[in-house]
Amino acid sequence: MQIFLDSTDTKVIADLASTGLIDGVTTNPTLIAKSGRPMLEVIAEICDIVPGPISAEVAATTADAMIAEGQKLAKIAPNVVVKIPLTRDGLIACAAFADEEIKTNVTLCFSPTQALLAAKAGATYISPFIGRLDDYGFDGMDLIRDIRAIYDNYGYETEILAASVRNAAHVKEAAIVGADVVTIPPAVFSDLYKHPLTDKGLEQFLKDWASTGQSIL
C-alpha cells in the first residue's frame, strides 16, 4: 500500500518525507486556503520535496475550464496529478486528460457507481471519502470493498485512493479491504507506528542493557 500525505505544509511534508515512507501528497482548495500562499508556488515546492504523485485540484466547475486549469497545473512538474471533482463535467474533463496522458485523481466519491464511471473515464486514481461517509452513518469501508470488487471484475487500472482518513484504524481497514493508496493528515502518521507496549518494551530493554555495562560500538 502507498501512503500519501494530505497537506500543504511544506515543512511538515519535508520532515515526514525524510522517513522514506511517504509516496505522494494530496492537496485541496481548503488546504491551499489555509496555507495562505499562492497555489502554484505551493504545488511546485511540494513537487521538489516529494518525487511521487502530487495531487493539485482544479477550482473550475465546467469541463472546458477544468481542462484549461488542469493543463496549466500539469505543467508545474511531471509528477503533478490533476485532481477533479466527481461531477458530469469532471468526468468529461477526466476523459480528455486521459487522452492527453495527464494523470488524474477524481475526488469526492461517495458511491460505487461514481467510481465505475471514473474508471470508465480513465481516472488514474479514485478518491472515496471514508470519514465523511462515517460522519453520515455509513460504513466507508463498504464503499472501498464495492469499488475493489467492481474494478477487479472488469480489470480497471484506476487505483483506489482512500481519502478523508481520520485515524490509524481507517488505514488498517483500508489496507485490509484492498485500497491501493491511503492519504492521511500528518497527525495520523505517528499513530501508525506508536504503541504504548512498544514504548514499555523498549524502556525495559534499555534498562536491562544498561545494567550489563556493555557497548556495541
UniProtKB/Swiss-Prot annotation:
Main enzyme class: transferase
PROSITE patterns: TRANSALDOLASE_1 (PS01054)
Pathway: Carbohydrate degradation; pentose phosphate pathway; D-glyceraldehyde 3-phosphate and beta-D-fructose 6-phosphate from D-ribose 5-phosphate and D-xylulose 5-phosphate (non-oxidative stage): step 2/3
GO molecular function terms attached to this record: aldehyde-lyase activity; transaldolase activity
Reactions performed catalytically: D-sedoheptulose 7-phosphate + D-glyceraldehyde 3-phosphate = D-erythrose 4-phosphate + beta-D-fructose 6-phosphate
GO biological processes: carbohydrate metabolic process; pentose-phosphate shunt
Gene3D superfamilies noted in UniProt: Aldolase class I
A Pfam family per the record: TAL_FSA
EC number assigned by the record: 2.2.1.2
Compartments reported by the entry: Cytoplasm
Gene Ontology annotations for the cellular component aspect, listed alphabetically: cytoplasm
Keywords annotated in UniProt: Cytoplasm, Pentose shunt, Schiff base, Transferase
InterPro entries tied to this protein: Aldolase_TIM, TAL/FSA, Transaldolase_3B, Transaldolase_3B/F6P_aldolase, Transaldolase_AS, TSA/FSA_arc/bac
Main location, first listed in the record: cytoplasm
Keyword set includes Transferase: yes
Active site as annotated: K83 (schiff-base intermediate with substrate)
Role, per record: Transaldolase is important for the balance of metabolites in the pentose-phosphate pathway.
Family the UniProt entry places it in: Belongs to the transaldolase family. Type 3B subfamily.
Descriptive protein name: Probable transaldolase
Lineage: Bacteria, Pseudomonadati, Pseudomonadota, Alphaproteobacteria, Caulobacterales
Gene field: tal
